A protein has these predicted regions:
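Transmembrane alpha-helical segments of polytopic membrane transport and secretion proteins
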Residues: 1-3
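Early transmembrane hairpin of solute transport permeases
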Residues: 5-168
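Generic recognition of stable, solvent-exposed alpha-helical segments in well-folded globular domains
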Residues: 11, 23, 27, 69, ...
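Small-residue-rich segments of transmembrane alpha-helices in multi-pass membrane proteins
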Residues: 96, 171-180
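Short alpha-helical linear motifs
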Residues: 111-117, 186-188, 201-202
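Alpha-helical transmembrane segments and their membrane-interface exit regions
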Residues: 145-150, 172, 200-207
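Hydrophobic alpha-helical membrane-associated segments
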Residues: 152, 179-191
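Aromatic-rich transmembrane-lumenal/periplasmic boundary elements in polytopic membrane proteins
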Residues: 185, 192-223
Length: 223
């Protein structure tokens, strides 16, 4: 593998560490709050139970929105300059993708009946931030984060003169990103269900293949 490819993979790995490092803290707080609200240990409706429910509700926002956290974290980490702009563009791009994908599923007649994430579990679609979208999970955040960072690094220094001056730099990056994100939202409606089926099939093979499954997992992990 070329050194350039190795450097790119190392940069991506480091970018992943930002959001990942917050997860143990969120998980620990969620575990503590679950114990505090366990009716086998405390009285339901009491102060401790109420506090546990309150903490659990707040911390669950971290666990339940990993996609957007990875999107912002990866884009900010991979940006070579003006990282705050990259983070903001990542957030906007994520919201645009959600809205565009939800609308495309609707107009294309691909929306599966269900009003909650639990009702849509296993269908390949979910409810994310109020939008009925293709369920890409954390992969959406990873992919969008990388795309935003690449476009940001390529066009962040673009400037114009005269009346167009206000549309340079991060604003021009958004202009470039918008059609890319819209196309990605449409393509995901058709491509991701197939990719997800492949991932599930591979998981099933590794789980049922015994020693070979362990070898395959180790091999892919090393690759």
């Amino acid at each position: 593998m070329k050194q350039k490819d190795m450097d790119a993979m190392q940069s991506f790995s480091k970018a992943l560490m930002g959001p990942v490092l917050f997860l143990p803290i969120a998980g620990m707080l969620q575990a503590i709050s679950s114990v505090m609200s366990n009716t086998a240990l405390v009285t339901e409706g009491g102060v401790v139970w109420t506090l546990g429910k309150f903490i659990n509700g707040g911390v669950s926002a971290v666990i339940g929105n990993l996609g957007i956290l990875f999107c912002v974290g990866i884009a900010m980490s991979l940006a070579k300059k003006r990282k705050a702009d990259a983070a903001f563009l990542a957030l906007v791009s994520y919201l645009v993708w959600l809205a565009a994908n939800a609308r495309w599923l609707d107009v294309a007649g691909l929306t599966i009946a269900g009003d909650t994430a639990s009702a849509l579990y296993g269908t390949g679609q979910t409810i994310c931030l109020g939008y009925h979208v293709t369920d890409m999970g954390v992969f959406l955040g990873m992919i969008l984060g990388v795309v935003v960072a690449l476009v940001h690094n390529r066009f962040i220094d673009t400037e114009f003169e005269g009346a167009m001056a206000m549309y340079g730099n991060s604003k021009f990056v958004f202009v470039v990103l918008l059609p890319i994100v819209l196309v990605m939202a449409v393509v995901a409606s058709y491509v991701w269900p197939v990719a997800a089926a492949g991932i599930n099939a591979l998981t099933g093979v590794m789980a049922s293949a015994g020693a070979f499954g362990v070898f395959l997992y180790g091999f892919l992990n090393r690759v």
